[in-house]
Amino acid sequence: MPKILEFDESARRALERGVNRLADAVKVTLGPKGRNVVIDKKWGAPTITNDGVTVAREVELEDPYENLGAQLVKEVATKTNDAAGDGTTTATVLAQALVNEGLRSVAAGASPILLKRGIDAAAQAVSETLLSRAREIDERGDIAYVATNSAQDKQIGELIAEAFDKVGKDGVITVEESQTFGMDLEFTEGLQFDKGYISPYFVTDPDRQEAVLEDALILIHQGKISNLAELLPLLEKIVQTKKPLLIIAEDVEGDALGALVLNKMRGTLSVAAVKAPGFGERRKAMLQDIAILTGGQVIAEEVGLTLENAELDVLGKARRITVTKDTTTIVDGAGDQSEVNDRINQIRKEIEATDSDWDREKLQERLAKLAGGVCVLRVGAATEVELKERKHRLEDAISATRAAVEEGIIAGGGSALVHAAKTLEGDLGRTGDEATGVAIVRRALVAPARWIANNAGAEGNVVVSRIAELEPGHGYNAATGEYGDLVAQGIIDPVKVTRSAVQNAASIAGMLLTTEALVVEKPEEEENAEGGHGHSH
């Protein structure tokens, strides 16, 4: 495939145009008065959203050079979303401001390498400042504020606070679609571990990239499964039950994996396979936890059980299993509650007996998984479009709340960044182009606050100047149009979200400024559309 190349200033300008086009579409969603974006879908109803990362993911530009710029910013949004579950729009706005300011300096003759060094140092300093100003949260009211802020919906905030109340900060909260209107919360005994599906062919919901198994059987195997002949007798019995199957094993490979994928593709058997969590002795213990919770048995040579002679009664059962690329959640296992309680007490005794901090931490994780349970938030709406949008907001709000519990909170509304910019006023003692890099970050940090104000119909630059005069923790409440103590008013952001946004934006901006050449595939020549028929005029 032939390539085309672009160099120097024109390459960077093309990237900048792509960054601007994507960021302009995303930043209209920022703040309590952010607008919606309607996204056309090839199939089904269009999506209406005010979630930055959803907008970013949909953008593909026609010009290949501009598209590279857009993809880089998309990376900022996605990385921030992965790390903190929110803050994608803030990260995009920051990246755009850094790129625009930075390219201006490069065009004026500054060294991109030194600029990048200054930008990185400034991002690190801002990140540390934000952390030092963070306030820990444990109050239910604070949790409700964070969730309300993320979802822009008080009802969602209250529900999530209640969910965290029930499962604690280590517990699992999942979101399911409901047939009724409104939202409700259900607490079920369940367990989640950090292993996802072995093959993406097991996915049942392509939109969300998940495998969902309802009323499923669970095969728990301590070793590897690679030989199809060993697995076949049990598989045939399972197919007759017409129930979906989850396989948890050290690994599933070779013939066995091929046969499972083939059966899944043909619709003979709804199946998903995941690797067992943990290592060594801990893996054995966790498999035993899963077996007790689901009423199954671990198939292992040491207890005289092999795959060939296994019957259906060694399989566990659960009402619902959700497998993503990274996690597996088992809800409502069919295990005997008294046995589960015995297991929980046994783990508690082990925690008291151990003198290793690492062991204690891992045992507490197992305890939280067994005793904590799973909170299921059910969400319903009048239309499919509204349902997707509400579900998305709920998931974002849960991630943001987790981030807040982890690292604490700071004032929201972009004001924490305006105040953090003051730590960069002496250019961190840098000189020359490095000092310019620090100054670029200082100027870019006010962009989120400016856009929150602009979207609310206020004059952004005036609002930013006013915020800078206030003490840290105070700022502009875009919902009411007033200035005041934002933390007291419940306008707060998780510090992890804001830090991730700054660091990811700085990382991409630094890479973009130091770009000197672009290589893209040459577009194929369009065939003559008339194909030789008819007359040309």
UniProtKB/Swiss-Prot annotation:
GO biological process, one term: protein refolding
Localization terms from the record: Cytoplasm
Reaction catalyzed: ATP + H2O + a folded polypeptide = ADP + phosphate + an unfolded polypeptide
Top-tier EC class: isomerase
UniProt family annotation: Belongs to the chaperonin (HSP60) family.
This protein's record includes keyword Nucleotide-binding: yes
Enzyme Commission (EC) number: 5.6.1.7
GO CC terms, sorted: cytoplasm
Keywords from the named record: ATP-binding, Chaperone, Cytoplasm, Isomerase, Nucleotide-binding
Keyword flag Nucleotide-binding: yes
NCBIfam families: GroEL (TIGR02348), PRK00013.1 (NF000592), PRK12849.1 (NF009487), PRK12850.1 (NF009488), PRK12851.1 (NF009489)
GO molecular function: ATP binding; ATP-dependent protein folding chaperone; isomerase activity; unfolded protein binding
Binding site residues for ATP: T29, L30, G31, P32, D86, G87, T88, T89, T90, G413, N477, A478, A479, D493
HAMAP family in the record: CH60
Signal peptide annotation: none
Role summary: Together with its co-chaperonin GroES, plays an essential role in assisting protein folding. The GroEL-GroES system forms a nano-cage that allows encapsulation of the non-native substrate proteins and provides a physical environment optimized to promote and accelerate protein folding.
Protein name, per record: Chaperonin GroEL 2
Subunit and partners: Forms a cylinder of 14 subunits composed of two heptameric rings stacked back-to-back. Interacts with the co-chaperonin GroES.
